[in-house]
Amino acid sequence: IDTCRLPSDRGRCKASFERWYFNGRTCAKFIYG
């Protein structure tokens, strides 16, 4: 699985994990949790 191609899903947990998604032009970072 190419993790950079996954959608940006922030989730419902109270943790804070760094994740990546493809924003249409580049692989971008977001915080999950």
From Swiss-Prot:
Sorted UniProt keywords: Protease inhibitor, Secreted, Serine protease inhibitor
InterPro entries: Kunitz_BPTI, Kunitz_BPTI_sf
GO molecular function, one term: serine-type endopeptidase inhibitor activity
Domain of life per record: Eukaryota
Summary of the tissues where the protein is detected: Expressed by the venom gland.
GO BP annotations, alphabetical order: envenomation resulting in negative regulation of voltage-gated potassium channel activity in another organism
Subcellular compartments: Secreted
Primary location recorded for the protein, binned into one broad class: secreted
S-S bonds: none
Site, as annotated: Reactive bond for trypsin: K14, A15
GO cellular component, one term: extracellular region
BPTI/Kunitz inhibitor domain ranges (all copies): 4-33
Pfam family, one: Kunitz_BPTI
Family assignment from sequence similarity: Belongs to the venom Kunitz-type family. 02 (native) subfamily.
Primary role: Serine protease inhibitor that inhibits trypsin at a molar ratio of 1:1.
Name by which UniProt lists this protein: Kunitz-type serine protease inhibitor hainantoxin F7-25.66
Natural source organism: Cyriopagopus hainanus
